[in-house]
Amino acid sequence: MTGTVSRRKKIAMIGSGMIGGTMGYLCVLRELADVVLFDVVTGMPEGKALDDSQATSIADTNVSVTSANQYEKIAGSDVVIITAGLTKVPGKSDKEWSRNDLLPFNAKIIREVAQGVKKYCPLAFVIVVTNPLDCMVKCFHEASGLPKNMVCGMANVLDSARFRRFIADQLEISPRDIQATVIGTHGDHMLPLARYVTVSGFPLREFIKKGKMTEAKLAEIVERTKKAGGEIVRLLGQGSAYYAPALSAITMAQAFLKDEKRVLPCSVYCQGEYGLHDMFIGLPAVIGGGGIEQVIELELTHEEQECFRKSVDDVVELNKSLAALG
């Protein structure tokens, strides 16, 4: 008796640095999909792939982890996660640059990646991680021509996770019981939605009323969330966060591969939502087998709208700079 053999799922990691290698490892642990680690740096993807592959024996999972320096190896990938690009401006100290300064360097890289994805896996769900995030998602989308619902960016899942962790630590409870969302751009003008935070379904404001947290402490947590990436950079002295960013991207990939219909905040294309058009920015969205299946619109107060507008203005200016590059 013969039957149809289902094809194994495949994820391509474009960029095999700390985030890329960690994402490969997470795929091994979760037995999520076969992995291709791609990088233009010879030796890096080969070494990371070998290390991740050997971990399958210990994890008792059956995942193929291979390496590539040529785009044809990513052919047929169901998901592509892009971390390729510079993480700091050459010749400048950590105090002399911001994520936005990476634009001219990383736009060129993203456009090259877009051509490879367009040629070899045009049906893939693409998650961009490269900074400046929202602008780089737009850059990839325009260069690749992939459908809007199949292109998004990872930042807000990470920002929201940090927000949840800080609140959980203050309340001395598990972060799994904290529901909190950060929208807007991945930078100083991100908007942690403190008003919408719940604890196992109960409004955080009820805990504040009972003295479990003060309004001042909540405001402090909001500001810490905005600076959380920089806090890690300063503590490390070299490099930046990679465990939480990697898990954030894999969570999004899993939602697509398993059609989980997860509500996850991420950089998505706006078609009138929040009064925005033709731009990518961080908003809560439903991720399932159809990619970005729905963008969720929340009611914002006047103050929240003003904060969100600052995020929008940041992205608009970056998009103008992107267009000026030609």
From Swiss-Prot:
Gene Ontology molecular function, alphabetical: L-lactate dehydrogenase activity
Enzyme Commission code(s) on record: 1.1.1.27
Gene Ontology BP annotations: lactate metabolic process
Gene3D superfamilies assigned: Lactate dehydrogenase/glycoside hydrolase, family 4, C-terminal (3.90.110.10), NAD(P)-binding Rossmann-like Domain (3.40.50.720)
Catalytic residues, chain numbering: H186
Reaction catalysed by this enzyme: (S)-lactate + NAD(+) = pyruvate + NADH + H(+)
Pfam families for this protein: Ldh_1_C, Ldh_1_N
Pathway note: Fermentation; pyruvate fermentation to lactate; (S)-lactate from pyruvate: step 1/1
NCBIfam families: MalateDH_bact, PRK06223.1
Subunit structure: Homotetramer.
PANTHER family hit by this protein: L-2-HYDROXYCARBOXYLATE DEHYDROGENASE (NAD(P)(+)) (PTHR43128), L-LACTATE DEHYDROGENASE (PTHR43128:SF16)
Protein name: L-lactate dehydrogenase
Organism: Toxoplasma gondii
Lineage of the species this protein comes from: Eukaryota, Sar, Alveolata, Apicomplexa, Conoidasida
